[in-house]
Amino acid sequence: MGKLKHTVCYLCGAMDRVADGGVTWRRTITPKLKKLGVGVLDPCDKPTECAVEDDDFRNNIENAKKEKNFRFIKESMREVAAVDLRMIDIAHFVVMYMDVSVHLCGSYHEAFTAIQQKKPLLVVCEQGVENMPNWMFGVMPLEHMFS
C-alpha cells in the first residue's frame, strides 16, 4: 500500500464506442484505487469544465457527423485530446481497460504516450492476455498485462 500512496493514476479506455460511455469499469476501480491512497484522473469525470464528454457532447458529435460538419468535430475533439493527454502527463501510472471487440483510437494514443514517457501502463484485457494485440507484447512488460 505504501508505494502507491500519493501517486496519481489515469484511467484509459474506450468512451465513444461503448454503450455506457466507459463509465462502468471506471466507477468500479476508482474506489479501490482511492482506498490505496491513489489519486484518480478519470476522463469520464474530468477535473476541468472544458472537454466534458457527456451524453450531450456525444449526441452533438454524432449529429455533426450526420451533417458532415467535420470542423465542429475537429474543434471539439482537439480540446478533448489536449485535456486527456495532459492528464497522461500528470499521472504517475496508467490503468487501461481493453476490450478488443471495441475500436480504440484515443486509448491507444494515450497508452503509447504513457509508454514513451516511461510510465507504467497496466492493461486489463476483457478477452484475456492471449487476445491482446501483438504490438502490445513488443512495447510493454508481460508483468503489466492482466486478464
Which ranges hold each PLM region?
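Conserved catalytic or regulatory cores that recognize and/or transform ribose-phosphate-containing ligands
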Residues: M1-S147
